[in-house]
């Protein structure tokens, strides 16, 4: 077992590699040396799993008094985001999986970074208070996720000219960043 102080999780099964036996939008069964593991997945992971017979998933094991549940993710960054989401009070594993099924990890990170309550609240089962709590508790933490720095860097490079123009018009740097991030998130192909 690996104890990581940073997240205060104890990880026992961190990945599974094996033969794909069954696949549905909510779970897969992976045969690993004769043992079939039932693994809960998000729609995001489901969409990335091909029809290949061999599969590798990064996992998170949740042990409760009455159940052991294994959650699988196609990418480490999705697993990291899941772990952050379930660290928020009021967000359990099912809600975390629902969030990752409703929005892509990049959309969730972007909504948190831009404090876009409406995007997070649009997810089934997430109310106003929970969406505000997710943003408040994770805003600083999502920057440590793999890919978030790159996303922010791309946002800065793409929109530096637009940001300068908005600042000349009197908007603060924080307001400018929020506005441009929202525009780029809502219109991914747009050139600002």
Give each language-model segment a name.
Residues 110-113, 184-192:
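Short amphipathic alpha-helical segments at helix boundaries and their inter-helical linkers
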Residues 134-184:
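Strongly charged, low-complexity linkers/loops
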Residues 115-125, 134:
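Anionic-ligand binding region
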Residues 2-87, 192:
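Structure-specific DNA junction-binding interface
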Residues 80-84, 95, 116-119, 158-165, ...:
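A general alpha-helix detector
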Residues 85, 100, 108-113, 120, ...:
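A short amphipathic alpha-helix within small helical-bundle interaction modules
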